[in-house]
């Protein structure tokens, strides 16, 4: 636990972070996509209970969608890529199973994967002539079931074009967003929805329903998170006030109770574009860090004006902690908090090479550019990286939507890469909170010989499922803190503190 002095120092470096010279990291291009196995990967990768990485491509696969069918893929610990689903299985338009997957996959409590497609499905709308999108479930073996087709209601009142990753909340239900649709103005400004694992969808909020008052936001696109208080938090790409002529304003941060009550807690750039010192157009999922504060990014604005990284209290007090200047990257994609409590992120463009984007670190030393894409001729190392994910081996993984193999796609079909920064292997608890008696899945590496599990020093019973998965139970008397797992190769510690509830 940090002392009050340490907390003060932590706050100070966030406020005054400055660019510093990067120490040596190891960047490795693991593979180039070749269109047949997919193209334009755009999702944050996830690590599943089998230890493999999973993601999607927005293009490639079956050649029936003018290049935009999309695929789902997995990568094993040897770096082998397997395409385990290609969209538009029927081989012709319309793609009833969906097309252009969007938002990261999630693995739900039933072990299956869930995700969305922006287009496809049987229902067309004013802004989605090739289908208004789907929600799907797919088994680890690749059997896909469509759970919901959007625009199933008159005037797309249920939403259209879902965007961002789904979230499985503590009540077991899935929550997500659509970028358009709903009963608002001009074909709808987007919705928030709740979905059971059986496919029953309930629209719980419609954005800008009281046009021209769009203070709740317009176009949620990057997925929700569940805060420590049980409420959901997210961002809308635009909106935040009263729409004036064509001015859509510059985005919001909102809080959503599970009963559907939405509160806008921050509106960006109320001073008016381009003077947006607090940023404009929020991107990526919010992160509620180990200190309870929310962190996020905006795609534009700041003093650069190439976007910002910010922190914000639950009451809406926002502080800009870094403003991109172009040479350090521009137009960030989002951030994540790693096992060392530091923040890692990516930018879509700019950087030292003038294009391609960057990977960066924000820690107690300050802001550090870790890698500049397009460092190789013709951007064969990739360009426009996704938000990073950290594997339980301590290594960061990500994709780039362009660059790489120039022979298969104009400008490259995209890449998959890794970045090491000297971080150790760890275990990840899912969920990372719960009361005594709750089952918890521990993900890690080399867990087959696990000999003990403890919650902040309290021994727990456990069952070894595989080399990458152990199931344990929160023991009676446990207190909040790190989980430790003893294996033949040493002791692994959880990446975040497990929060014991009562």
Predicted regions and their residues:
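Extracellular beta-propeller repeat domains
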Residues: 2-502
């Amino acid at each position: 636990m940090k002392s009050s002095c340490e907390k003060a120092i932590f706050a100070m470096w966030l406020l005054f972070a400055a660019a510093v010279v990067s120490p040596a990291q190891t960047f490795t291009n693991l593979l180039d996509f070749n269109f047949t196995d997919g193209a334009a990967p755009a999702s944050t990768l996830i690590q599943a209970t089998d230890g493999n990485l999973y993601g999607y491509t927005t293009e490639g696969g079956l050649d029936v969608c003018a290049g935009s069918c999309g695929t789902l893929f997995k990568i094993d610990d040897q770096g082998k890529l397997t395409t385990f689903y290609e969209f538009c299985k029927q081989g012709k338009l319309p793609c009833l199973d969906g097309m252009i997957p969007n938002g990261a996959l999630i693995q739900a409590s039933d072990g299956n994967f869930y995700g969305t497609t922006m287009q496809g499905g049987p229902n067309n709308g004013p802004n989605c002539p090739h289908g208004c999108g789907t929600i799907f479930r797919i088994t680890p073996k690749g059997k896909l079931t469509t759970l919901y087709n959007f625009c199933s209601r008159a005037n797309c009142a249920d939403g259209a074009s879902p965007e961002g990753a789904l979230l499985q909340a503590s009540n077991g239900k899935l929550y997500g967003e659509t970028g358009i649709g709903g009963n608002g103005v001009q074909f709808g400004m987007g919705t928030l929805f709740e979905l059971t694992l059986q496919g029953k969808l309930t629209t719980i909020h419609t954005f800008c329903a009281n046009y021209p008052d769009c203070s709740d936001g317009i176009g949620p696109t990057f997925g929700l998170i569940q805060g420590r208080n049980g409420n959901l938090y997210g961002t809308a790409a635009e909106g935040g006030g009263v729409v004036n002529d064509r001015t859509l304003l510059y985005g919001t941060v909102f809080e959503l109770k599970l009963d559907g009550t939405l509160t806008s807690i921050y509106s960006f750039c109320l001073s008016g574009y381009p003077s947006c010192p607090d940023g404009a157009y929020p991107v990526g999922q919010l992160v509620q860090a180990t200190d309870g504060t929310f962190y996020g990014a905006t795609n534009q604005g700041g003093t650069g004006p190439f976007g910002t990284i910010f922190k914000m209290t639950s009451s809406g007090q926002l502080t800009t902690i870094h403003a991109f200047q172009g040479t350090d990257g521009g137009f960030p994609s989002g951030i994540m908090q790693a096992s060392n409590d530091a923040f890692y992120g990516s930018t879509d463009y700019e950087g030292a090479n003038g294009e391609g984007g960057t990977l960066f670190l924000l820690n107690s030393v300050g802001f550090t550019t870790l890698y500049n894409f397009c460092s190789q001729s013709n951007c064969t190392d990739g360009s426009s990286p996704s938000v990073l994910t950290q594997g339980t081996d301590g290594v960061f993984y990500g994709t780039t939507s362009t660059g790489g193999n120039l022979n298969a796609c104009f400008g490259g079909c995209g890449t998959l890469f890794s970045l090491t920064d000297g971080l150790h292997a760890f275990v990840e608890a899912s969920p990372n909170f719960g009361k005594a008696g709750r089952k918890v899945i521990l993900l890690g590496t080399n867990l087959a010989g696990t000999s003990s599990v403890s919650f902040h020093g309290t021994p727990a019973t456990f069952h070894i499922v595989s080399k990458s998965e152990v199931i344990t139970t929160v023991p009676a008397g446990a207190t909040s803190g790190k989980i430790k797992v003893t294996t033949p190769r040493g002791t692994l510690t959880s990446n975040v503190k497990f929060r014991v509830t009562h």
